[in-house]
Amino acid sequence: MHRASLICRLASPSRINAIRNASSGKSHISASTLVQHRNQSVAAAVKHEPFLNGSSSIYIEQMYEAWLQDPSSVHTSWDAYFRNVEAGAGPGQAFQAPPATAYAGALGVSPAAAQVTTSSAPATRLDTNASVQSISDHLKIQLLIRSYQTRGHNIADLDPLGINSADLDDTIPPELELSFYGLGERDLDREFLLPPTTFISEKKSLTLREILQRLKDIYCTSTGVEYMHLNNLEQQDWIRRRFEAPRVTELSHDQKKVLFKRLIRSTKFEEFLAKKWPSEKRFGLEGCEVLIPAMKQVIDSSSTLGVDSFVIGMPHRGRLNVLANVCRQPLATILSQFSTLEPADEGSGDVKYHLGVCIERLNRQSQKNVKIAVVANPSHLEAVDPVVMGKVRAEAFYAGDEKCDRTMAILLHGDAAFAGQGVVLETFNLDDLPSYTTHGAIHIVVNNQIGFTTDPRSSRSSPYCTDVGRVVGCPIFHVNVDDPEAVMHVCNVAADWRKTFKKDVIVDLVCYRRHGHNELDEPMFTQPLMYQRIKQTKTALEKYQEKILNEGVANEQYVKEELTKYGSILEDAYENAQKVTYVRNRDWLDSPWDDFFKKRDPLKLPSTGIEQENIEQIIGKFSQYPEGFNLHRGLERTLKGRQQMLKDNSLDWACGEALAFGSLLKEGIHVRLSGQDVQRGTFSHRHHVLHDQKVDQKIYNPLNDLSEGQGEYTVCNSSLSEYAVLGFELGYSMVDPNSLVIWEAQFGDFSNTAQCIIDQFISSGQSKWIRQSGLVMLLPHGYEGMGPEHSSARPERFLQMCNEDDEIDLEKIAFEGTFEAQQLHDTNWIVANCTTPANIYHLLRRQVTMPFRKPAVVFSPKSLLRHPMARSPVEDFQSGSNFQRVIPETGAPSQNPPDVKRVVFCTGKVYYDMVAARKHVGKENDVALVRVEQLSPFPYDLVQQECRKYQGAEILWAQEEHKNMGAWSFVQPRINSLLSIDGRATKYAGRLPSSSPATGNKFTHMQEQKEMMSKVFGVPKSKLEGFKA
């Protein structure tokens, strides 16, 4: 109950009834009158019961909720108070003094002054100074406890260097001072009843001194707990119990020994690397060595709770340590990365602190096998976050793990990047979305209180680097790394929280960086005082070693034996690493598909056509909806139109997509289509999810209703994010090659907000990390007068990143047999601009039937979705048909090649513009139009065929994009390498260079179109009067 609502219960019965009746429709009181009555009620109640004013009301609301659940859970005086409120007591009548029994002594009130009636009827108020004071004091204690729960983290001892305050504020919040409540030294030994919203003692009451000490021990030492921003009382109480309950954080001697051994591995590993390779960059973990025990504790606890697959995303710092001591990648394999060895595999490879791995091993605590994958990633901080989440979601999907009980993400962050990178919030925002949730990740922040050389006061505007987590309701646990036992407790709570509530949680390891940004960097230039202190600071291992020796947990001999044992392990691994003669990139696969490549001929491309009966059945289903389903009238016409297209043997783009998806689904292949508005389609062509017009949330997906045993079709509208969602779908595509995963941009122009994923992961992922992906990017593209932000998917950028040489030696290359398959095998990705429904159908099916996986960048159409010429006959989908890399001229010019004056190569929608213009200017016999449907790998063989067919013709490349954009700079050297043997060269016909992708003026757009057509057909612009593309 909100404060005003509760207070209104104290108003006169007539006002209460008026308000109740107004809200239930029994009265005609206007909204303004209702507000006036409410305000009067609040004022009257506060006047007679002053403890309802100010911040006290927040606590009273919580106590009222607790009382509704269990009246005995609150103080007897509050029980009587709430009973009287419920019974309709007016202002000044609800409060009663506490009873003489039970609590009178504790509250310092005489029994005579504390007599109270607890019947349900309103009682006469006993207005004694003692009773008012007792309840006032009681409330002050409750508010004091709440203040520590809310603000205690602000004064916690979090910085292991003792220099900074983790929240960038050295002041003490006034509400944590006794004087704020009118309390002082005189009250320290008075005993107070504990409220139901704390668990600091098993007793019902404590002295103020004891209360203060417990609160400081819990909230103000080496752990700072942020959780009062959660809007769920059950979650708040859950966290309180795990931090406030006495002795809850204590470890056994055996647990302390395990922690000590893990600290040895973490610390001595870095020291060993520093000794052997002092001038090598490795981005070590010195200053936050406790990260390794922390991660292992999260994995131990989560494994015990049922998780058996962990996907880790992390930056470069500490990566080698994680690979060695969390994943248990063989040490010799890691150490060999420091040697200058020849790679055994193709590809560029990557630096050692970017590499991923996938390991399966026994977890000793749970005695279960667990799989741990560290996802390879670039130096672009936080870019890996959504990739990890997508991989987790896919693993859970294929395992039938609907609630991610067995699959979990662990994301590591740096403090500056966590606060600074927008993709962090984009990724957080996916967490509760039905088709993207992974049901909670554990975030661990390596908070070394500096970003390269930037002070945190210059790198964030919020108090903590973790404040982004407050937006989505994460509990946040700040912990000083010099208290490893506190870190272990926090990690246990984090694992338990994720299991219980399936929500994200943040562990903020407040630490330092012992060296510079890397081992060769000099930090004293910019942080002299901090690094003077660091030089004087012992390692966490040294401090914890002293602690366990002082506590008698271990003796000197035990410590020495453990240190010697791990030192020997490192030296043996070093000796073995010297015997390694080459580096195997395949040792660092984060998503291995070993079974997929077995018994597959990498140079054999199966046919992608399907049987006629399948075509009819899929289109039939795609055109129907269930009986009793209230479909929009406009969609009824659309569905009938699909059936008619089948009868007319003329299928449109939506049917081509549906046939690709439906045929794969019937073969048991999982299809996932994701992006903004993909269910309907940005241009309202798809309608894969039908909505009942009368029943909210009632939907029908016809492609999920094709046949029994079919693959699942997931078509999901995404959040308005490109960066995180594309990264998510990339991670999803990495898990199972027997799937079709597609991301569609709302407009291709917007894909550049995901440029980091495109550049660092998709275009180069296989070369760097031997990681294949069949992800498809659909990027709506086409110049239709819609301005610079709704015209171009920037094809020039994607083509520039293709790994294909633009020169070809015709004497050494044979354009036959396996040429097409070899090109596909060798390329880093496929770039296409299809013009027919049949071709997009074949391209999508080919993504799954190929014996390997390659990303595909497809410049998809807008106006062609409904263009009457952009149709395909049924036979183009049938068995024996395949993707056409080049679609040759099939009209009159193809019948008389010697008469052809010009051959115009093009790609995409502009073809249909040129067909219309060719007819308009009467050039249908002497200008041949050839469509290049697949730009990369470039179809040298088929382009050569067309050039040879029209030996005497002039060769042009036409495009609607500006000269410095589009495919021109990509195709020119390639076509010329084919023509050079005949002494010919291709010419350009299109728009002039420009800084802007397109004009926003409709008139200018039409003039540019006519200018382009004038160049294409060699006619004056006057001949194009009246032409409309």
From Swiss-Prot:
What GO cellular component is one of the record's annotations? mitochondrial matrix
Top-rank taxon: Eukaryota
State where Mg(2+) binds. 415, 448, 450
Locations listed in the record: Mitochondrion matrix
Q: Which residues bind thiamine diphosphate?
A: 317, 415, 448, 450, 676
**EC class of this enzyme?**
oxidoreductase
Where does the chain cross the membrane?
Answer: none
Q: Which UniProt keywords apply?
A: Glycolysis, Magnesium, Metal-binding, Mitochondrion, Oxidoreductase, Thiamine pyrophosphate, Transit peptide
Q: Which GO terms describe its molecular function?
A: metal ion binding; oxoglutarate dehydrogenase (succinyl-transferring) activity; thiamine pyrophosphate binding
Reaction(s) catalysed by this chain, per the record, are: N(6)-[(R)-lipoyl]-L-lysyl-[protein] + 2-oxoglutarate + H(+) = N(6)-[(R)-S(8)-succinyldihydrolipoyl]-L-lysyl-[protein] + CO2
Q: What cofactors does the UniProt entry give for this protein?
A: thiamine diphosphate; Mg(2+)
- Gene Ontology biological process: generation of precursor metabolites and energy; glycolytic process; protein folding; tricarboxylic acid cycle
InterPro entries tied to this protein: 2-oxogl_dehyd_N, 2oxoglutarate_DH_E1, DH_E1, KGD_C_sf, ODO-1/KGD_C, THDP-binding, Transketolase-like_Pyr-bd
Task: Please state the Enzyme Commission number of this protein.
Answer: 1.2.4.2
Role noted for this protein: The 2-oxoglutarate dehydrogenase complex catalyzes the overall conversion of 2-oxoglutarate to succinyl-CoA and CO(2). It contains multiple copies of three enzymatic components: 2-oxoglutarate dehydrogenase (E1), dihydrolipoamide succinyltransferase (E2) and lipoamide dehydrogenase (E3).
Q: Quote the subunit structure annotation.
A: Homodimer. Component of the 2-oxoglutarate dehydrogenase complex.
Identify its protein family: Belongs to the alpha-ketoglutarate dehydrogenase family.
| Name by which UniProt lists this protein | 2-oxoglutarate dehydrogenase, mitochondrial
Gene source species: Caenorhabditis elegans
Tell me the name of the encoding gene. ogdh-1
